Amino acid sequence: MAELSLAELREIMRQSLGEDEVPDLADADTVTFEDLGLDSLAVLETVNHIERTYGVKLPEEELAEVRTPHSMLIFVNERLRAAA
């Protein structure tokens, strides 16, 4: 079973930002995507990348509550376990 790691999420977020700078996720449980410079479009690009890479559907209506990298990890990994 595949699982999304914090390092993988960090790289996907860097790609979504379109920058060489990698976001610092030291406080992944409290820092928001907005604090990291990701607007809603960048978060959507991150979600789309995860869906393509991991072959999992992440329902948009449930994503509204996902505001931090840590909550994204939990959200994605729960879906991956359910799909296994």
UniProtKB/Swiss-Prot annotation:
The keyword Phosphoprotein applies. One of its GO terms (molecular function) is phosphopantetheine binding. Pathway: Antibiotic biosynthesis; daunorubicin biosynthesis; Antibiotic biosynthesis; carminomycin biosynthesis; Antibiotic biosynthesis; rhodomycin biosynthesis; Antibiotic biosynthesis; aclacinomycin biosynthesis. InterPro entries: ACP-like_sf, PKS_PP-bd, PP-bd_ACP, Ppantetheine_attach_site. One of its GO terms (biological process) is daunorubicin biosynthetic process. The modification O-(pantetheine 4'-phosphoryl)serine is found at residue 40. Pfam families: PP-binding. PROSITE patterns: CARRIER, PHOSPHOPANTETHEINE. Residues 3-80 form the Carrier domain. Keywords: Antibiotic biosynthesis, Phosphopantetheine, Phosphoprotein. Involved in the biosynthesis of aklanonate which is an important precursor common to the formation of the clinically significant anthracyclines such as carminomycin, daunorubicin (daunomycin), rhodomycin, aclacinomycin T (aklavin) and aclacinomycin A (aclarubicin). These compounds are aromatic polyketide antibiotics that exhibit high cytotoxicity and are widely applied in the chemotherapy of a variety of cancers. This is Anthracycline acyl carrier protein DpsG.
